[in-house]
């Protein structure tokens, strides 16, 4: 049979699930432990545990926790962080590879945890504080606090707090009520069981019970009241612990926390309780136990006292005792020898033996109960003494002494006495005296030796004597003392004494001094035995001292020899000067020791002598004020203390008064970087000034300038723009510095100067200028036009809109420096400068004075310009233009033309003023020459015949060869020949002339025919007309000689000569005559002025003359006139005479004014020859003399003074000045012989090097890499350097190659030869 194929099916049986699923939450419900039993299926590889949140009847997949474990691991799984109060489905399946069994599952709800450590931390009558530890968990949302009164069910208080809070204060409670307080943990869907506490008391209990001051029948009980509760009272109950029937209680005020319990039983234990009472309720008691102390025995008594024993009695205390303890010890020094005895409670007495005789004992009795002791009962008792007392030395000599003592209260057989020298150098001596004696002598001792004497009282039987405690005394035998103590000298701090020496040998003397009043230190000194005199120092003034002198031996000293003395008054100390002012001083001093009644203060200086201050300072003062002193003067001040008739030594000091500061501090010429400071100098002799300038409101460098004493201004440069500066000016005198004159100045803003300035037009009195500016704020322009001489500058401030300006009011033919500034409020720019020269103005007022047939004499008014000459041209109609040669000098105002002029011809005259390369427009005039003259014969006075004289030609007139001219102002002065350099450092000699003075014509000498008499007028005058060219004519007497006319335009005849007819009478007319000599070709007339500085005048007349009229000499001047006849080359003196000139006369001549001079500067009039002083406008001091000249003319010059830096110095006066390089120079005024010059030499005490000043000191400077030492010698010696050392080298460099010698290159002594310079500007004024 064939079988069918089997049908096969594979069936896998399901895996069995685990069994015995068990869920175990932790006590705090924080974790869940899941456990199970293994699946019975084989091959299980592991288990999967799933915990899912169950919401309603469904699982919430979003809240699932899953864990897997292998078969080899324990079948336990722990889940944490489960939310309390939530229901979870926990399932477990068996896993075999990829197969899973059916799950086994259970549901569980995690309990909400309750608080476990809730407690009270503070309980008061109305509040309770709660504290707990917050639980951790994401579902805990907080805590609810519930308060329920005890016995009630409805809460009276409920509140919620956050999940992290662990503290809560329950307030608003009523005192005396019990409360149940619960705290419940809240979660999202539930809450925990409540944790409840109940307040057990109606009110809090007192604390800190203490017992102090416990005695046998009392004790002090203290406690601490409960906080934050107002109680009604405290109740204190106390009762013996063994007898509760004797309980007692006390009610205490609630404000008290202590009570004293009294009337207690000694040695008894008490139970003490303290209750806090609120209304009628009591708190839990605060209880303690304390035993009272034992009471002490009483009635202490002593009896049966001997030298070595006594008996003690007492009475028993109330408390029960177990015995007594008795302690005793000597009162003095016996605490360490304390003895102790104990007796039973039945005893009440005790005999103490073996005590020390004559000793006070302290006895203490204690009641004892077990270990407890009472306060001791204390008493004192002394044993009987057997020792002598009060041992003393009753008398002593150098070799013996007597002693005595008091006997003891016991029987004494005899006394044993010993004595020996201190130090143990001699053996002990001993003797006895009977027991009924209480004194004894000791002999055979050494003088001045110290002995120890001891006395013993001997008691007892003779075979066993008992010696008492000894009594001892020390004594020194006396030494022979000195005699005749005398006080020989007394000072304020010392006393000198002398004495006669001791008759016995001594080792020295001790001298002491003690204030008799007892107040003050004792001074003691020891001197050798051969000295019998001493000065005691260090004493107080005006104190009475007791002076003692002791003679000293080897073993001691004698009784003192005593004398008293009073020390003198002490002098003041510590003189100091405060508040030093210009004319006053305040002085202070330290008051002397001792008594002072008053002080005498004197002060002196060489100029004023000695003065005493009145009223004198009192004795309690220590200051004084001196007034009326000289500024900058050194004073010697003396202060003397006075007391009764005593006077101290003087306290002396010196002090220099202050110098006054400069005043009237002014600031000018303020620019952005500089300022000019000026001041008024003080009225004292100074050595210099110091100017300090420092910024006021911001940081910057400080400037300091040292100036000479003649300075009154300083220019400070290098300042910061628009900066406020504080300026201080100090006056210096040697080492003294005055208080500063101070001021505040602000530099200006930086303003841009004008640009592109130029001159567009120039006339005689105007200059037109133009300029440009930057585009910035401008408030105006300032223009200064300063002439070359510096006089009368023109200043103008104009509108900011102008860029062209015409400067008017200028002087013709003058060089000007024109400065243009840009203005901005108070600030101005630096100047731009233009040099300009005004045009030369033309001469004016042409006048023809004299005409002849071949010459014209004319004059003109000179222009205001300073000229260098004139050009004079002339022409006739149809003829060429000719020029007068030589050209007239700048001071000329007239000219005579006689070359090739044609008679009866009209000439045109051109006068052109010349200044260097500049020419003025011409002054033009026309004049006709005279026709040829006719020969006229006139009758001569006193002569019968007719004589014909021919006038001499002008061409034959000799000229003075040397002429000198003025400074260009049209006035010619003698002796001012310009600047001369004679090698002196100096100044300008300043000359002035005042008063109208007509241009002077040449002096004319006129020969006079016989028979003509000319009167003389003599007028004193210093004026010298010698600068002009004199012309000489013979006086031809014509019958019809026309009178002189003032009309200058009217022509005069040839006979009148070249006379100027408008002079005012200052020229003189003098006629002289002489005896004619044969063969004389001409006569030379020389006029020598007597007593003044005029230049001698010389004239010539023809040899046929025997007399001449001299015109043009100074009126009133004295001349020595010499007439010499010239024969070929030989001269023969014809006549010599001295005469005083007189004024010219004749009709039509104007006579001079009154001969006085009026000076408008001084406002005074002066007679002819009178002299006076005045100041020039430029600061020179002048010496003036009235000349008159008929016009009030006077002449001034500065030759009697030296002028320097605005100050004037007389001849011989010296002063200091600062040189151009800053060095100090010493100057001396030389005076008239040097024409106002002064000589300056290096200052005798100062040296200058590299801009620094040194005064008698040394400094170092570098030369060729070496350091040289320089020394200032001053004056002509200067300074020199030597001792040059090169650092690190041993060779000293030298300019001449010689090692160690003074460097010749560096031995500068700046021996500047005295430089003398003479500048003589002349200023002349011509009043209209």
Curated annotation (Swiss-Prot):
PROSITE patterns: EGF_1, FN1_1, FN1_2, FN3. Forms covalent cross-links mediated by a transglutaminase, such as F13A or TGM2, between a glutamine and the epsilon-amino group of a lysine residue, forming homopolymers and heteropolymers (e.g. fibrinogen-fibronectin, collagen-fibronectin heteropolymers). GO terms for biological process: acute-phase response; cell adhesion; regulation of cell shape. Residues 1157-1288 are annotated as: Fibrin-binding 2. One of its GO terms (molecular function) is heparin binding. The keyword Repeat applies. Residues 1155-1199, 1200-1243, 1245-1287 form the Fibronectin type-I domain. Residues 1-14, 17-112, 114-202, 205-295, 296-386, 387-480, 481-572, 573-660, 661-754, 755-841, 842-933, 1054-1145 form the Fibronectin type-III domain. Disulfide bonds join 1157-1186, 1184-1196, 1202-1229, 1227-1240, 1247-1272, 1270-1281. InterPro entries: ECM_Regulatory_Proteins, Fibronectin_type1, FN3_dom, FN3_sf, Ig-like_fold. Keywords: Acute phase, Cell adhesion, Cell shape, Disulfide bond, Glycoprotein, Heparin-binding, Repeat. Residues 658-929 are annotated as: Heparin-binding 2. The lineage of its organism: Eukaryota, Metazoa, Chordata, Craniata, Vertebrata. SUPFAM superfamilies: Fibronectin type III (SSF49265), FnI-like domain (SSF57603). SMART domains: FN1, FN3. This is Fibronectin. Residues 1054-1069 have a biased composition (Polar residues). Residues 1045-1069 are annotated as: Disordered. Dimers or multimers of alternatively spliced variants, connected by 2 disulfide bonds near the carboxyl ends. Glycans are attached at residue 89. One of its GO terms (cellular component) is extracellular region.
């Amino acid at each position: 049979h064939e079988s069918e194929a089997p049908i096969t099916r594979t069936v896998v049986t399901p895996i069995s699930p685990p069994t015995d699923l068990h869920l175990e939450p932790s006590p705090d419900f924080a974790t869940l432990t899941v456990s199970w039993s293994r699946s019975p299926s084989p091959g299980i590889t592991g288990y999967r545990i799933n915990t899912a949140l169950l919401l309603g009847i469904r699982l919430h997949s979003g809240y699932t926790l899953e864990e897997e474990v292998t078969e080899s691991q324990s079948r336990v799984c722990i889940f944490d962080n489960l939310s309390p109060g939530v229901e979870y489905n926990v399932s477990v399946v068996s896993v075999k590879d990829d197969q899973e069994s059916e799950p086994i599952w259970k549901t569980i709800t995690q309990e909400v945890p309750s608080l476990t450590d809730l407690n009270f931390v503070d309980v008061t009558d109305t509040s309770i504080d709660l504290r707990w530890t917050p639980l951790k968990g994401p579902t805990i949302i907080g805590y609810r606090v519930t308060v329920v009164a005890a016995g009630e069910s409805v809460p009276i208080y409920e509140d919620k707090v956050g999940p992290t809070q662990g503290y809560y204060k329950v307030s608003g409670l009523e005192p005396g009520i019990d409360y149940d307080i619960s705290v419940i943990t809240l979660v999202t869907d539930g809450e925990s069981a409540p944790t409840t506490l109940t307040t057990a008391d109606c009110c809090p209990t007192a604390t800190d019970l203490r017992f102090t001051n416990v005695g046998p029948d009392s004790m002090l009980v203290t406690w601490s009241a409960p906080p934050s509760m107002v109680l009604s009272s405290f109740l204190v109950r106390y009762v013996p612990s063994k007898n509760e029937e004797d309980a007692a209680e006390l009610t205490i005020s609630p404000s008290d926390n202590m009570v004293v319990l009294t009337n207690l039983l000694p040695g008894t234990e008490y139970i003490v309780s303290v209750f806090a009472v609120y209304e009628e309720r009591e708190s839990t008691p605060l209880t303690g136990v304390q035993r009272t102390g034992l009471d002490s025995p009483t009635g202490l008594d002593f009896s049966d006292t001997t030298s070595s024993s006594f008996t003690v009695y007492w009475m028993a205390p109330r408390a029960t005792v177990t015995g007594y303890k008795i302690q005793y010890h000597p009162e003095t020094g016996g605490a360490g020898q304390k003895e102790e005895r104990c007796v039973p409670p039945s005893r009440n007495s005790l005999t103490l033996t073996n005590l020390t005789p004559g000793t006070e004992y302290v006895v203490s009795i204690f009641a004892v109960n077990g270990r407890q002791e009472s306060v001791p009962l204390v008493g004192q008792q002394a044993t009987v003494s057997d020792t002598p007392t009060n041992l003393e030395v009753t008398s002593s000599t150098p070799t013996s002494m007597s002693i005595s003592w008091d006997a003891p209260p016991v029987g004494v057989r005899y006394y044993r006495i010993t004595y020996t020298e201190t130090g143990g150098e001699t053996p002990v001596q001993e003797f006895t005296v009977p027991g009924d004696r209480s004194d004894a002598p000791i002999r055979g001792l050494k003088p001045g030796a110290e002995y120890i004497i001891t006395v013993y009282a001997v008691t007892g039987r003779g075979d066993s004597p008992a010696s008492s405690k000894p009594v001892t005394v020390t004594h020194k035998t006396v030494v022979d003392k000195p005699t005749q103590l005398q006080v020989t000298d007394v000072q304020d701090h010392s006393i000198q004494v002398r004495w006669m020496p001791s008759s016995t040998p001594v080792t020295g003397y001790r001298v002491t001094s003690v204030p008799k009043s007892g107040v003050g230190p004792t001074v003691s000194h020891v001197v050798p035995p051969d000295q019998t005199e001493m000065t005691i120092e260090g004493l107080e003034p005006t104190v009475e001292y007791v002076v003692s002198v002791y003679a000293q031996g080897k073993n001691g000293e004698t009784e003192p020899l005593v004398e008293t003395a009073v020390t003198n008054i002490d002098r003041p100390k510590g003189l100091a000067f405060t508040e030093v002012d210009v004319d006053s001083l305040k002085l202070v001093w330290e008051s002397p020791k001792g008594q002072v009644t008053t002080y005498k203060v004197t002060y002196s200086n060489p100029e004023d002598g000695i003065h005493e201050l009145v009223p004198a300072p009192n004795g309690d003062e220590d200051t004084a004020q001196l007034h009326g002193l000289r500024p900058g003067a050194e004073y010697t001040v003396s202060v003397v203390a006075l007391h009764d008739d005593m006077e101290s030594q003087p306290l002396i000091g010196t002090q220099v008064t202050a110098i006054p500061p400069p005043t009237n501090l002014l600031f000018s010429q303020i620019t952005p970087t500089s300022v000019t400071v000026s001041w008024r100098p003080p009225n004292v002799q100074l050595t210099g000034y110091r100017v300090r300038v420092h910024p006021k409101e911001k940081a910057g460098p400080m400037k300091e300038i040292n100036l000479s004493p003649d300075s009154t201004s300083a220019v400070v440069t290098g300042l910061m723009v628009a900066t406020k500066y504080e300026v201080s000016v100090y006056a210096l005198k040697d080492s003294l510095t005055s208080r500063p004159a101070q001021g505040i100045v602000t530099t200006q803003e930086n303003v841009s100067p004008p640009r592109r300035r130029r001159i567009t037009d120039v006339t005689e009195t105007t200059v037109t200028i133009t300029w440009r500016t930057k585009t910035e704020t401008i408030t105006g322009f300032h223009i200064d036009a300063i002439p070359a001489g510096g006089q009368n500058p023109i200043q103008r401030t104009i509108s900011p809109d102008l860029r062209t300006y015409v400067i008017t009011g200028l002087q013709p033919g003058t060089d000007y420096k024109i400065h243009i500034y840009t203005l901005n409020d108070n600030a101005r720019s630096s100047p731009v400068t233009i040099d300009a020269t005004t045009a030369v103005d033309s001469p004016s007022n042409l006048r023809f004075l004299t005409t002849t047939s071949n010459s014209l004499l004319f004059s003109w008014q000179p222009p205001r310009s300073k000229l260098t000459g004139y050009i004079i041209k002339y022409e006739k109609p149809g003829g060429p233009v000719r020029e007068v040669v030589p050209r007239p000098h700048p001071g000329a105002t007239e000219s005579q033309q006689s070359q090739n002029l044609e008679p009866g011809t009209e000439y045109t005259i051109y006068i052109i003023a010349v200044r260097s390369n500049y020419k003025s427009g011409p002054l033009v005039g026309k004049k006709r020459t005279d026709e040829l003259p006719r020969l006229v014969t006139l009758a001569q006075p006193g002569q019968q015949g007719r004589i014909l004289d021919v006038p001499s030609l002008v061409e034959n007139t000799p000229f003075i060869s040397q002429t000198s001219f003025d400074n260009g102002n049209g006035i010619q002065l003698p002796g001012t020949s310009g600047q001369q350099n004679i090698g002196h450092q100096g100044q300008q000699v300043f000359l002035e002339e005042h008063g109208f003075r007509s241009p002077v014509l040449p002096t004319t000498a006129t020969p006079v025919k016989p028979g003509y008499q000319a009167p003389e007028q003599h007028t004193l005058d210093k004026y010298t007309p010698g600068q002009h060219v004199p012309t000489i004519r013979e006086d031809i007497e014509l019958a019809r000689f026309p009178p002189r006319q003032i009309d200058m335009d009217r022509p005069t005849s040839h006979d009148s000569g070249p006379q100027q007819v408008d002079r005012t009478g200052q020229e003189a007319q003098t006629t002289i005559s002489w005896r004619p000599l044969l063969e004389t070709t001409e006569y030379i007339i020389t006029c020598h002025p007597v007593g003044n500085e005029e230049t001698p005048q010389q004239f010539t007349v023809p040899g046929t003359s025997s007399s001449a009229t001299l015109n043009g000499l100074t009126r009133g001047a004295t001349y020595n006139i010499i007439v010499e006849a010239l024969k070929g080359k030989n001269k023969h003196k014809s006549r010599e005479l001295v005469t005083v000139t007189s004024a010219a006369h004749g009709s039509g001549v104007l006579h001079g004014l009154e001969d006085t001079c009026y000076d408008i500067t001084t406002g005074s009039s002066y007679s002819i020859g009178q002299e006076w002083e005045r100041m020039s406008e430029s600061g020179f001091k002048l010496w003036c003399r009235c000349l008159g000249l008929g016009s009030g003319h006077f002449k001034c010059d500065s030759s009697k003074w030296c002028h320097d830096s605005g100050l004037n110095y007389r001849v011989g006066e010296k002063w200091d000045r600062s040189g151009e390089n800053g060095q100090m120079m010493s100057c001396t005024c030389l005076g008239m012989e040097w024409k106002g010059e002064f000589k300056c030499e290096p200052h005798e005490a100062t040296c200058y090097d590299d801009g620094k000043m040194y005064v008698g000191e040394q400094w170092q400077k570098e030369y060729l890499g070496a350091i040289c030492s320089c020394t200032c010698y001053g004056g002509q010696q200067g300074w020199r350097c030597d001792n040059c050392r090169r650092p690190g080298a041993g060779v000293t460099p030298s300019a001449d190659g010689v090692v160690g010698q003074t460097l010749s290159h560096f031995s500068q002594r700046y021996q500047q030869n005295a430089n003398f310079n003479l500048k003589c500007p002349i200023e002349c004024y011509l009043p209209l």
